[in-house]
Amino acid sequence: MVIEMFNFWYFFWMILQIGATVGLYFAFRKSRPFVQNTVLFSLLVLGLIFHFLKMYIPPYGELVDGQWVITSRGWRDSWFVNVCGANIALFPFIFLTKNKYLKDYMFHIGVLTGLIVLFYPQEPIAKGDAASQMAEFLDILRFYYHHWMIMAVPLLMVLWKRHTLSYKRVWVAPVGILLLMLFIILNQVFQSELGFIPLRNDEALVVPNYKNTSYIWGPLNGDGSMDPIGGIFDIFCPDVFKKLPVSCEGYGLEEGAVKYWPWFWMIVPAFILVTPLAFGLSMIFDGKRFGKDTVYFVRHIKAGGLKDDFKRLGRRIRKAVTEENPNKVAAK
């Protein structure tokens, strides 16, 4: 078995994931809400367990003199250092909440990241030839389960009406992904401080040294070249977030040298790219309400409703000011 773009095994795993999602949908679509919630939560918990158990399979561990030893990569990757890994940790807790904003985030980011991996399974492909992939077959299984789970659970949650999406809450997708990146940064800083990863190399302020799969530290590869996917985000990044604001004498870098501001450089691209994708997903499930709201809004404008709205807003502002400073208003 060797997984390559568009070969038999590429489509095999894709069809298997789609089939599993469709199968679960029909198997439990008429079940009681308690059963549906139990199935979905069990899948999430199983994913969290697998995340830590992966330290006991190659390449995260190896046999040394008859004993299983966790490798340095195993210790590094047991943390939550990319978007999918962080969601594996957070989704079980989000699912238990009744917060509609968090569950909208769970749906949008889960489905979007799951679809990306469904069509571009980068990690298995990067393992190399058939021998290398077979040596790490259990990790390939883990990879596909985790990324299928991240997509399937939120999708089934909405299809089974365990949660109702709203197009008015699409803003939680870009905001949520940016907050998630702060969580990842915190993980990586702790890892670096505790010695699990050398977060920076000798050119510390130029390119990241390890674990930048979520592009938090910039779109550049370790050799300084532009990553193909990161380059898409780079198009929408303001120039101010691509340069050093001051000189850094310790590294011989002058003010204005190329340096992507960690996290900040992703703010504008996240809103420009993620928001329309999340809105598109919302239209699948909330398109009718959007249509009705649009018709109402157009009629409201034609009837002169906006003018009345601004008048009411003005009265509310004056009332609020009056209640806050009654003495000043009386003096006037």
Predicted segments, located by residue:
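Membrane-interface transmembrane-helix boundary segments in multi-pass integral membrane proteins
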Residues: 2-15, 171-179, 193-283
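Alpha-helical transmembrane segments in multipass membrane proteins, preferentially the mid-helix core
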Residues: 20-26, 88-92, 149-170
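Membrane-interface capping segments at transmembrane-helix boundaries
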Residues: 28-34, 279-296
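Membrane-interfacial loop-to-transmembrane alpha-helix junctions, especially the N-terminal start
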Residues: 33-46, 101-107, 173
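A glycine-rich, hydrophobic loop/mini-helix early in the fold
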Residues: 37-92
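Aromatic-anchored segments of alpha-helical transmembrane domains
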Residues: 46-56, 110-122, 177-188
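Membrane-proximal helix-loop-helix units in multi-pass membrane proteins
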Residues: 88, 94-153
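Short, highly charged, low-complexity non-transmembrane loops/tails of multi-pass membrane proteins
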Residues: 288-328
